[in-house]
Curated annotation (Swiss-Prot):
Signal peptide: none annotated. The record marks T2, M3 as: Cleavage. One of its GO terms (cellular component) is host multivesicular body. Residues 17-30 have a biased composition (Basic and acidic residues). Disulfide bonds: none annotated. This is Genome polyprotein. Keywords: Capsid protein, Host endosome, Host-virus interaction, Ion channel, Ion transport, T=pseudo3 icosahedral capsid protein, Transport, Viral attachment to host cell, Viral ion channel, Virion, Virus entry into host cell. Residues 1-30 are annotated as: Disordered.
Length: 56
């Protein structure tokens, strides 16, 4: 019996399978939805840093 046969039968877990459960994925998507303005905040931070450097 080859390793691929064992993986196919569910006897052996593939090391490249995603170990996260469905609950983990739901939690991660909920966290991502909680940061809707991340890109905007990053852009504002870049502008603030730019202005601060210009004042030096």
């Amino acid at each position: 019996e080859t390793m691929l046969d064992r993986i196919a039968s569910g006897d052996l877990e593939s090391s490249v399978d995603d170990p996260r459960s469905a609950e983990d994925k739901r939690f991660e998507s909920h966290i991502e939805q909680g940061k809707p303005y991340k890109e905007l905040r990053m852009e504002v931070g870049k502008q603030t840093l730019k202005y601060a450097q210009e004042e030096l």
